Protein backbone atom coordinates (compact mmCIF):
# COMPACT_ATOMS: atom_id res chain seq x y z
CA UNK A 1 0.00 0.00 0.00
CA UNK A 2 1.34 3.40 -0.97
CA UNK A 3 1.32 6.20 1.58
CA UNK A 4 -0.40 9.32 0.22
CA UNK A 5 1.78 12.29 -0.65
CA UNK A 6 1.07 15.21 1.67
CA UNK A 7 0.58 18.71 0.24
CA UNK A 8 3.93 20.38 -0.34
CA UNK A 9 5.85 17.09 -0.28
CA UNK A 10 7.54 15.33 -3.18
CA UNK A 11 7.01 11.59 -3.85
CA UNK A 12 9.95 9.49 -2.72
CA UNK A 13 11.88 7.70 -5.43
CA UNK A 14 10.81 4.05 -5.79
CA UNK A 15 7.13 4.46 -4.79
CA UNK A 16 4.79 2.11 -6.63
CA UNK A 17 2.65 3.51 -9.50
CA UNK A 18 -0.93 4.37 -8.77
CA UNK A 19 -3.80 2.45 -10.39
CA UNK A 20 -4.13 5.14 -13.08
CA UNK A 21 -0.46 4.76 -14.21
CA UNK A 22 0.49 2.01 -16.57
CA UNK A 23 3.68 0.17 -15.54
CA UNK A 24 5.11 0.14 -19.07
CA UNK A 25 4.91 3.90 -19.48
CA UNK A 26 6.50 4.44 -16.08
CA UNK A 27 9.49 2.31 -16.99
CA UNK A 28 9.98 4.20 -20.28
CA UNK A 29 9.77 7.58 -18.55
CA UNK A 30 12.22 6.45 -15.87
CA UNK A 31 14.71 5.24 -18.46
CA UNK A 32 14.43 8.51 -20.39
CA UNK A 33 14.91 10.52 -17.22
CA UNK A 34 17.98 8.51 -16.22
CA UNK A 35 19.44 8.93 -19.70
CA UNK A 36 18.87 12.68 -19.67
CA UNK A 37 20.48 13.01 -16.25
CA UNK A 38 23.47 10.94 -17.35
CA UNK A 39 23.93 13.02 -20.51
CA UNK A 40 23.65 16.20 -18.47
CA UNK A 41 26.28 15.02 -16.02
CA UNK A 42 28.64 14.10 -18.86
CA UNK A 43 28.17 17.50 -20.51
CA UNK A 44 28.75 19.28 -17.18
CA UNK A 45 31.86 17.23 -16.51
CA UNK A 46 33.19 17.99 -19.96
CA UNK A 47 32.59 21.71 -19.61
CA UNK A 48 34.08 21.77 -16.14
CA UNK A 49 37.16 19.93 -17.29
CA UNK A 50 37.72 22.43 -20.10
CA UNK A 51 37.34 25.50 -17.89
CA UNK A 52 40.56 27.42 -17.37
CA UNK A 53 41.40 30.00 -14.73
CA UNK A 54 41.02 33.61 -15.72
CA UNK A 55 44.06 34.81 -17.67
CA UNK A 56 46.48 36.90 -15.65
CA UNK A 57 46.62 40.33 -17.25
CA UNK A 58 49.93 41.10 -18.90
CA UNK A 59 51.78 43.71 -16.86
CA UNK A 60 55.13 45.28 -17.67
CA UNK A 61 57.34 46.86 -15.02
CA UNK A 62 60.97 47.82 -15.50
CA UNK A 63 63.21 50.63 -14.38
CA UNK A 64 66.24 52.73 -15.14
CA UNK A 65 69.04 53.01 -12.57
CA UNK A 66 67.57 50.46 -10.16
CA UNK A 67 70.78 50.63 -8.12
CA UNK A 68 72.40 53.82 -6.91
CA UNK A 69 73.47 55.89 -3.92
CA UNK A 70 71.16 58.02 -1.80
CA UNK A 71 69.67 60.43 -2.65
CA UNK A 72 68.47 58.63 -5.76
CA UNK A 73 65.70 58.87 -8.36
CA UNK A 74 64.42 55.87 -10.33
CA UNK A 75 62.43 56.15 -13.56
CA UNK A 76 59.99 53.26 -13.90
CA UNK A 77 58.51 52.06 -17.19
CA UNK A 78 55.16 50.31 -16.95
CA UNK A 79 52.24 49.05 -19.01
CA UNK A 80 49.00 48.22 -17.19
CA UNK A 81 46.62 48.74 -20.11
CA UNK A 82 45.32 45.15 -19.91
CA UNK A 83 44.46 45.33 -16.21
CA UNK A 84 40.68 45.43 -15.72
CA UNK A 85 40.53 47.76 -12.75
CA UNK A 86 39.37 51.32 -12.24
CA UNK A 87 42.60 52.13 -10.42
CA UNK A 88 46.01 50.50 -10.58
CA UNK A 89 48.61 51.43 -7.97
CA UNK A 90 52.36 51.36 -7.69
CA UNK A 91 53.74 50.67 -4.23
CA UNK A 92 57.14 52.25 -3.77
CA UNK A 93 58.06 53.51 -0.29
CA UNK A 94 55.07 54.44 1.83
CA UNK A 95 51.47 54.78 0.59
CA UNK A 96 50.68 53.33 -2.83
CA UNK A 97 50.34 55.82 -5.66
CA UNK A 98 47.68 55.53 -8.42
CA UNK A 99 49.06 55.12 -11.94
CA UNK A 100 47.78 56.74 -15.10
CA UNK A 101 46.85 53.74 -17.28
CA UNK A 102 47.32 55.83 -20.41
CA UNK A 103 50.92 56.66 -19.56
CA UNK A 104 53.99 54.49 -19.19
CA UNK A 105 56.53 56.39 -17.08
CA UNK A 106 56.66 57.03 -13.34
CA UNK A 107 59.59 58.41 -11.34
CA UNK A 108 60.23 58.28 -7.61
CA UNK A 109 62.76 59.92 -5.30
CA UNK A 110 64.44 57.86 -2.58
CA UNK A 111 65.98 59.93 0.19
CA UNK A 112 67.19 57.11 2.42
CA UNK A 113 69.41 54.10 1.68
CA UNK A 114 67.53 50.79 1.78
CA UNK A 115 66.28 47.93 -0.36
CA UNK A 116 62.86 48.87 -1.70
CA UNK A 117 60.34 46.41 -3.13
CA UNK A 118 58.27 48.10 -5.84
CA UNK A 119 54.91 46.54 -6.70
CA UNK A 120 52.12 46.98 -9.23
CA UNK A 121 48.83 46.48 -7.37
CA UNK A 122 45.20 46.07 -8.47
CA UNK A 123 42.24 44.70 -6.50
CA UNK A 124 44.62 44.33 -3.52
CA UNK A 125 46.71 41.85 -5.52
CA UNK A 126 50.36 42.21 -6.48
CA UNK A 127 50.70 41.81 -10.24
CA UNK A 128 54.40 42.57 -10.67
CA UNK A 129 57.41 43.33 -8.47
CA UNK A 130 60.77 45.02 -8.90
CA UNK A 131 63.58 45.75 -6.44
CA UNK A 132 65.41 49.04 -6.02
CA UNK A 133 68.69 49.09 -4.09
CA UNK A 134 69.63 52.51 -2.76
CA UNK A 135 73.09 52.18 -1.24
CA UNK A 136 74.79 54.20 1.46
CA UNK A 137 78.36 55.46 1.46
CA UNK A 138 79.40 53.61 4.56
CA UNK A 139 77.31 54.27 7.66
CA UNK A 140 74.66 56.96 7.49
CA UNK A 141 72.22 58.13 10.12
CA UNK A 142 68.90 59.89 10.40
CA UNK A 143 66.48 61.12 12.98
CA UNK A 144 62.89 59.97 12.60
CA UNK A 145 60.34 62.52 13.71
CA UNK A 146 58.78 62.89 10.26
CA UNK A 147 60.63 66.08 9.44
CA UNK A 148 63.40 66.92 6.99
CA UNK A 149 66.75 67.14 8.72
CA UNK A 150 69.73 69.42 8.48
CA UNK A 151 72.69 67.81 6.70
CA UNK A 152 75.17 69.26 9.21
CA UNK A 153 74.62 67.04 12.27
CA UNK A 154 77.61 64.75 12.71
CA UNK A 155 78.56 61.71 14.78
CA UNK A 156 81.15 61.72 17.50
CA UNK A 157 84.27 60.45 15.78
CA UNK A 158 86.81 60.07 18.55
CA UNK A 159 85.28 57.46 20.86
CA UNK A 160 85.13 54.44 18.58
CA UNK A 161 81.36 54.23 18.30
CA UNK A 162 78.36 55.39 16.30
CA UNK A 163 76.77 58.10 18.42
CA UNK A 164 74.93 61.41 18.05
CA UNK A 165 74.98 63.78 20.99
CA UNK A 166 71.49 64.81 22.18
CA UNK A 167 72.52 68.47 22.03
CA UNK A 168 73.32 68.26 18.33
CA UNK A 169 69.81 67.11 17.37
CA UNK A 170 67.79 68.97 20.00
CA UNK A 171 66.85 71.80 17.57
CA UNK A 172 65.60 69.19 15.09
CA UNK A 173 63.22 67.38 17.44
CA UNK A 174 59.86 69.00 16.74
CA UNK A 175 57.40 66.37 17.95
CA UNK A 176 55.19 67.66 20.76
CA UNK A 177 55.95 64.78 23.12
CA UNK A 178 59.68 64.92 22.32
CA UNK A 179 59.64 61.21 21.41
CA UNK A 180 61.96 60.51 18.50
CA UNK A 181 64.16 57.77 17.10
CA UNK A 182 67.71 57.85 15.77
CA UNK A 183 68.92 55.31 13.27
CA UNK A 184 72.15 54.12 11.70
CA UNK A 185 72.22 52.19 8.45
CA UNK A 186 74.69 50.65 6.07
CA UNK A 187 73.27 49.47 2.75
CA UNK A 188 75.49 47.65 0.28
CA UNK A 189 76.14 44.21 -1.24
CA UNK A 190 77.43 42.34 1.81
CA UNK A 191 78.22 39.06 0.02
CA UNK A 192 76.39 37.00 2.64
CA UNK A 193 73.30 34.78 2.62
CA UNK A 194 70.47 35.92 4.89
CA UNK A 195 69.59 32.31 5.69
CA UNK A 196 73.15 31.47 6.81
CA UNK A 197 74.97 34.26 8.64
CA UNK A 198 76.10 35.51 12.04
CA UNK A 199 75.82 39.15 13.14
CA UNK A 200 77.64 40.33 16.26
CA UNK A 201 77.38 43.80 17.76
CA UNK A 202 77.52 45.73 21.02
CA UNK A 203 74.94 48.39 21.86
CA UNK A 204 74.19 50.88 24.62
CA UNK A 205 71.23 53.10 25.49
CA UNK A 206 70.53 55.00 28.70
CA UNK A 207 68.89 58.21 29.87
CA UNK A 208 72.19 59.93 30.65
CA UNK A 209 73.29 59.70 27.01
CA UNK A 210 69.93 60.53 25.43
CA UNK A 211 67.94 57.30 25.48
CA UNK A 212 64.19 57.51 26.11
CA UNK A 213 62.31 55.33 28.58
CA UNK A 214 62.18 51.62 27.71
CA UNK A 215 65.22 52.29 25.49
CA UNK A 216 63.70 50.35 22.58
CA UNK A 217 66.43 49.18 20.22
CA UNK A 218 65.84 47.53 16.85
CA UNK A 219 68.50 45.61 14.95
CA UNK A 220 67.60 44.64 11.39
CA UNK A 221 69.24 42.67 8.60
CA UNK A 222 67.73 43.50 5.21
CA UNK A 223 67.52 40.70 2.64
CA UNK A 224 66.42 40.58 -0.97
CA UNK A 225 63.44 38.36 -0.09
CA UNK A 226 62.64 39.27 3.53
CA UNK A 227 64.10 40.88 6.65
CA UNK A 228 65.35 39.76 10.05
CA UNK A 229 64.50 42.25 12.81
CA UNK A 230 64.75 41.94 16.58
CA UNK A 231 63.81 44.39 19.33
CA UNK A 232 65.44 44.82 22.73
CA UNK A 233 64.03 46.87 25.62
CA UNK A 234 64.82 47.45 29.27
CA UNK A 235 63.28 45.06 31.86
CA UNK A 236 59.59 45.76 32.43
CA UNK A 237 58.90 46.90 28.85
CA UNK A 238 58.52 43.55 27.05
CA UNK A 239 55.02 44.57 25.89
CA UNK A 240 56.70 46.67 23.18
CA UNK A 241 58.93 43.96 21.72
CA UNK A 242 58.58 42.95 18.07
CA UNK A 243 60.28 40.00 16.42
CA UNK A 244 60.08 39.70 12.64
CA UNK A 245 62.21 37.06 10.97
CA UNK A 246 61.07 36.31 7.42
CA UNK A 247 57.53 34.88 7.66
CA UNK A 248 57.58 34.60 11.48
CA UNK A 249 56.11 37.59 13.31
CA UNK A 250 55.83 37.81 17.09
CA UNK A 251 54.70 40.57 19.43
CA UNK A 252 55.26 41.14 23.12
CA UNK A 253 51.51 41.66 23.44
CA UNK A 254 50.63 38.16 22.29
CA UNK A 255 53.86 36.18 22.85
CA UNK A 256 56.19 35.79 25.80
CA UNK A 257 59.26 37.68 24.59
CA UNK A 258 60.42 38.75 28.04
CA UNK A 259 63.88 37.30 27.33
CA UNK A 260 64.44 40.30 25.04
CA UNK A 261 64.04 42.67 28.01
CA UNK A 262 67.66 43.20 29.03
CA UNK A 263 69.87 45.78 30.72
CA UNK A 264 72.20 47.41 28.21
CA UNK A 265 72.53 50.76 29.96
CA UNK A 266 76.21 49.85 29.88
CA UNK A 267 77.33 47.91 26.83
CA UNK A 268 75.35 44.81 25.84
CA UNK A 269 76.59 42.21 23.36
CA UNK A 270 74.04 40.87 20.87
CA UNK A 271 74.48 38.00 18.44
CA UNK A 272 72.06 36.81 15.76
CA UNK A 273 72.93 33.46 14.20
CA UNK A 274 70.94 31.98 11.31
CA UNK A 275 71.65 28.55 9.85
CA UNK A 276 69.41 26.79 7.32
CA UNK A 277 66.40 28.98 8.22
CA UNK A 278 66.85 28.42 11.94
CA UNK A 279 67.53 31.57 13.94
CA UNK A 280 69.13 31.93 17.37
CA UNK A 281 69.45 35.19 19.30
CA UNK A 282 72.00 35.65 22.08
CA UNK A 283 72.50 38.40 24.66
CA UNK A 284 75.83 38.43 26.49
CA UNK A 285 76.55 34.95 25.06
CA UNK A 286 73.33 33.54 26.54
CA UNK A 287 70.72 32.07 24.18
CA UNK A 288 67.48 34.03 24.68
CA UNK A 289 65.35 32.83 21.75
CA UNK A 290 65.31 30.41 18.83
CA UNK A 291 62.86 29.81 16.00
CA UNK A 292 62.50 28.32 12.53
CA UNK A 293 60.99 29.98 9.48
CA UNK A 294 60.00 28.91 5.97
CA UNK A 295 60.44 31.73 3.45
CA UNK A 296 64.02 32.61 2.44
CA UNK A 297 65.54 35.93 3.47
CA UNK A 298 67.84 36.08 0.46
CA UNK A 299 71.12 37.92 -0.01
CA UNK A 300 71.96 40.50 2.67
CA UNK A 301 71.82 44.09 1.42
CA UNK A 302 71.64 46.16 4.59
CA UNK A 303 72.14 46.42 8.35
CA UNK A 304 70.25 48.98 10.43
CA UNK A 305 69.99 50.06 14.07
CA UNK A 306 67.17 52.13 15.56
CA UNK A 307 67.17 53.63 19.05
CA UNK A 308 64.33 55.30 20.90
CA UNK A 309 66.03 58.58 21.61
CA UNK A 310 69.78 58.21 21.22
CA UNK A 311 71.89 55.06 21.44
CA UNK A 312 75.38 53.84 20.60
CA UNK A 313 76.87 51.04 18.50
CA UNK A 314 80.37 49.92 19.50
CA UNK A 315 81.13 47.51 16.65
CA UNK A 316 79.51 45.45 13.89
CA UNK A 317 80.76 42.09 12.63
CA UNK A 318 79.10 40.02 9.91
CA UNK A 319 80.11 36.44 9.09
CA UNK A 320 79.03 34.21 6.20
CA UNK A 321 77.89 30.57 6.23
CA UNK A 322 81.51 29.39 6.61
CA UNK A 323 81.92 31.71 9.62
CA UNK A 324 84.31 33.88 7.62
CA UNK A 325 84.14 37.64 8.24
CA UNK A 326 82.62 39.55 5.33
CA UNK A 327 82.28 42.89 7.13
CA UNK A 328 83.81 44.39 10.29
CA UNK A 329 83.83 47.90 11.72
CA UNK A 330 84.84 49.04 15.20
CA UNK A 331 84.44 52.75 14.37
CA UNK A 332 87.93 53.64 15.50
CA UNK A 333 88.64 55.62 12.34
CA UNK A 334 86.96 59.02 11.83
CA UNK A 335 85.83 58.07 8.31
CA UNK A 336 83.60 55.34 9.79
CA UNK A 337 81.23 58.01 11.09
CA UNK A 338 78.84 59.89 8.86
CA UNK A 339 76.46 62.81 8.86
CA UNK A 340 72.76 62.62 9.55
CA UNK A 341 70.63 62.15 6.45
CA UNK A 342 68.54 65.13 5.41
CA UNK A 343 65.49 63.04 4.62
CA UNK A 344 64.13 61.21 7.65
CA UNK A 345 60.58 60.67 6.48
CA UNK A 346 61.04 59.64 2.87
Where are these regions (language model features)?
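Cytosolic/nucleoplasmic/matrix-facing N-terminal domains/tails
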Residues: 1-9
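Extracellular/lumenal mature domains of secreted and surface-exposed proteins
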Residues: 12-168
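Extracellular Ig-like/FN3 beta-sandwich strand-entry sites
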Residues: 113-117, 194-196, 265-267
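Secretory/extracellular carbohydrate-interaction modules
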Residues: 138-141, 168-247
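Carbohydrate-binding surfaces in secreted/extracellular proteins
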Residues: 201, 263-294
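Extracellular beta-strand elements of beta-rich domains used
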Residues: 201, 272, 314-318, 331
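Short, aromatic/His-centered strand-loop micro-motif at the edge of beta-sheets
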Residues: 246-269
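Flexible glycan-contacting loops in extracellular carbohydrate-active proteins
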Residues: 291-318
Amino acid sequence: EVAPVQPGQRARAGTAPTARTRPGRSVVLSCCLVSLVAVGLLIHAGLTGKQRPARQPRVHLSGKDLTGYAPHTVHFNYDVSEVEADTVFIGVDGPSVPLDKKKHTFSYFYGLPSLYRTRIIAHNRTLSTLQVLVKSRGWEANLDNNYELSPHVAFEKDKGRLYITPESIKPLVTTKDKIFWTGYRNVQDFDADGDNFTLETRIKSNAEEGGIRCFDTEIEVIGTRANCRITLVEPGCSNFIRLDISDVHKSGRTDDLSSFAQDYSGWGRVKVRVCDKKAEIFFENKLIHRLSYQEPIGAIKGITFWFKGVGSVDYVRLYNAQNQPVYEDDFEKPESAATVSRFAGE
